[in-house]
Amino acid sequence: MNPLWQQYIQILNQVVKPALGCTEPIAAAYASAVARTLLGIVPEAISVQVSDNLYKNSMGVYVPGTGKIGLAIAAAAGAIAGNAEAGLEVLAAITPEQVAQAQDLIDAGKVKVERTETEEFIYCCVTLKAGEQEALVKICGGHTLIAEKRLNGEPVFTADNAQSAATGSICDGIDISIKSIYQFAQEVPFDQIKFILKASELNGKLSDEGMAKPYGLEVGRTMKSGIAAGIIGEDLLNKIVMLTAAASDARMGGANLPAMSNLGSGNQGIAATIPVVLTAQCYNVTEEKLARALIMSHLGAIYIKSHYPPLSAFCGNTVTSAAASMAMVYIAGGSFEQSCFAIQNVISDSSGMVCDGAKASCAMKVSTSSSAAVRSFLMALNSQNVSGQGIIATDVEKTIKNIGKMILNGMSSTDVTIIDIMST
């Protein structure tokens, strides 16, 4: 196989993977679970230090299997019941009795959570204590990327600089562009990319769960009620918005089902998957074409997001939906040029959406960006595109660079202000 394509598949396998619950509190649960394996016994006290962005994205979201919100329960649950071998599915097997045990630690004032100053956007340091024993695990640069382990102050593991610098772009040093992604998705042997169909299965189950039960703001179920009442129609646009939002409803509401995530975000994995799957159903395409479209969507989203930090004041569902829209054009038989039009259109439409933490209303943001994806792919099929207006350049690659520049140079103070507001 083309060595470059092997690199693309490696990227996908690295950052498109199942995640149970919002990945920021789950990072704390994972760190706690790893620390517990070092400590060897149930901790008497837990200390958690996190970056501002990880704190922001943990304040308002349910931790799966617990029915509770926040970093304290995530860390306590990880220490009591976490499976350190399960990565982002660390809490998959937690029981009600273990949740109660974790809550007892919190109620006794034995779980402390605080923000810490760090250059890393994803940072979590968990310390467990039991008697004279102490275990520390530090995560840095990625939700499950361990930078350091210590037992009773002695180093057990320290990652080298190259391994721990994951906050840098995952695409650094790789020849990648929208054009090369499009070509790869079209030409790579099908048997090499069948794995991406798991995204359809996992995120589809989350959508079904969100439609069946009252999670969060019930955005998906509310739209279903509107369809049943004849207020809105059940066309492709509304189905995509409804079912994408329903999956996010379930995820943000603590459903005990994993999402297939994209670059550390379950919601963005949902946004990269469900609109593409529903469009494939609408056009009655083959499983192979669906897989190629999902590769286009997920890898396209990863590439665009590699131009800015993994956590910021920018809602990544925007550019994820841009990549989904690109894939939707491909499904509908459009050209590469029209796929680029779709990306331009989505970014022009909804790039002003901010991230003010993970919470139930993320389902509304997912639905907003997904609706933009539908409008944009329809416009693109009609060869209508935004070009040379505002931050949208005449070339899609330049537009992507502009987005990165806007976030890196223009939104850092916005992020500080948002976190300050949320912490007041």
UniProtKB/Swiss-Prot annotation:
GO terms for biological process: L-cysteine catabolic process to pyruvate. InterPro entries: Ser_deHydtase-like_asu, UPF0597. GO terms for molecular function: L-cysteine desulfhydrase activity. It comes from the Bacteria. Belongs to the UPF0597 family. This is UPF0597 protein Sputw3181_2955. It comes from Shewanella sp. (strain W3-18-1).
